[in-house]
Amino acid sequence: MSSSEGVVHVAFLPSAGMGHLNPFLRLAATFIRYGCKVTLITPKPTVSLAESNLISRFCSSFPHQVTQLDLNLVSVDPTTVDTIDPFFLQFETIRRSLHLLPPILSLLSTPLSAFIYDITLITPLLSVIEKLSCPSYLYFTSSARMFSFFARVSVLSASNPGQTPSSFIGDDGVKIPGFTSPIPRSSVPPAILQASSNLFQRIMLEDSANVTKLNNGVFINSFEELEGEALAALNGGKVLEGLPPVYGVGPLMACEYEKGDEEGQKGCMSSIVKWLDEQSKGSVVYVSLGNRTETRREQIKDMALGLIECGYGFLWVVKLKRVDKEDEEGLEEVLGSELSSKVKEKGVVVKEFVDQVEILGHPSVGGFLSHGGWNSVTETVWKGVPCLSWPQHSDQKMSAEVIRMSGMGIWPEEWGWGTQDVVKGDEIAKRIKEMMSNESLRVKAGELKEAALKAAGVGGSCEVTIKRQIEEWKRNAQAN
């Protein structure tokens, strides 16, 4: 067995950003609930303070089940990497530091039963995985739809040697066997479609070509009722020949350790919940466009006008700075005193990190204006809240498509990416009204909530999949 007591021991290696880290820790917590021992390998330093705090709270919550090992990253000259995005730079820094991983793994006192690593680390990990005496698994932290695109890119690239995706992805989009319709070119992450080579594009092409190598399976935070078509296509061998099994282990539940223990955050949530308690059922729009990209000043003004005009109460999380830097100006400086006063009359505006799951679960919240980050998608499904999607970057248009196809949300494609043209306040108000007044969205959201609870509950697909993997790892250990 993998230890003297026969306990399954799983190592997790996440990548950069809360969008990657949070689902990794939720998956690790799920394995812990079923009796596994976890080693968390943490690249240091992290990009943001939020990541460091979350790792600390996770490890403190499971002191007897989790061993934390730091992967101290090598120094990388930013001028040698063609990106200004701090998270893309961190991806590359981690990739260049993976030669340091074997000595770290050698420190483990009990053998590994399995090694689970982030999708952004495939190629540089091959030489490490080759020497491991345990199965290895990818964890794809976005949708099954996005993973299908990722896997299919390797086929397209091999058929078009020497070409960039901007050349071989045409106006008719990406046709994926098993999908009823192609993925539109307009939904492909912009960095991939740049005519000139860039870091994100190179990582995508390099790793998609190696996705079938030394890989025993792929975990995805999704489930049949939400992404049945994509999961069936992936596991039916239609998307990519030789692809290992893809396991839908979602929706992964939020955990108690995710709640911030900082006094400022506790105070912020306390005042938010008090205000929500005073609102009528389903009357509040929750607005959050993610914590990775700041909202442009001109768009903030039109967002404010739209929220005032929509006629509903609102809780608006405003991001004025990238990552976790302190905002140097208040909302009043951006909006002006008159507009700022009107906003405060109608709703609540915060700049701090909030407990999104708690907010979405509050009875007064009737709709979510979201960027479509995959964590946010699974959380809104988990709580059964209709969604208005406004993708900001990367894979978020594909997430918006999942929400729209599910029947629990709307996606105004004409808004484009959040970094493009300013969407006017009257258009924002119109779409919020459409979401909040649409009973069919609410009914479908409720149905998906029930399906999510069933999938994550006793005897559900998530539990069955996790337990099956654990038993397989135990058999492997006995055979060895």
Swiss-Prot record:
Pfam families: UDPGT (PF00201). It is an enzyme of class 2 (transferase). UDP-alpha-D-glucose binds at residues 141, 354, 356, 371, 374-376, 379, 395-396. Residues 291-292 are annotated as: UDP. An anthocyanidin binds at residue 20. Changing residue 202 to A: No effect on catalytic activity. This is UDP-glycosyltransferase 708D1. It comes from Glycine max (Soybean). One of its GO terms (molecular function) is UDP-glucosyltransferase activity. Disulfide bonds: none annotated. UDP-glucose-dependent glucosyltransferase catalyzing the c-glucosylation of the A ring of 2-hydroxynaringenin. Also active toward phloretin, but not toward naringenin and apigenin. The keyword Glycosyltransferase applies. Belongs to the UDP-glycosyltransferase family. InterPro entries: UDP-glycosyltransf_plant, UDP_glucos_trans. It catalyses: a 3'-hydro-2'-hydroxy-beta-oxodihydrochalcone + UDP-alpha-D-glucose = a 3'-(beta-D-glucopyranosyl)-2'-hydroxy-beta-oxodihydrochalcone + UDP + H(+). SUPFAM superfamilies: UDP-Glycosyltransferase/glycogen phosphorylase. Keywords: Glycosyltransferase, Transferase. Changing residue 292 to A: Loss of catalytic activity. The active site is at 20 (proton acceptor), 118 (charge relay). The keyword Iron-sulfur does not apply. Its EC number is 2.4.1.360.
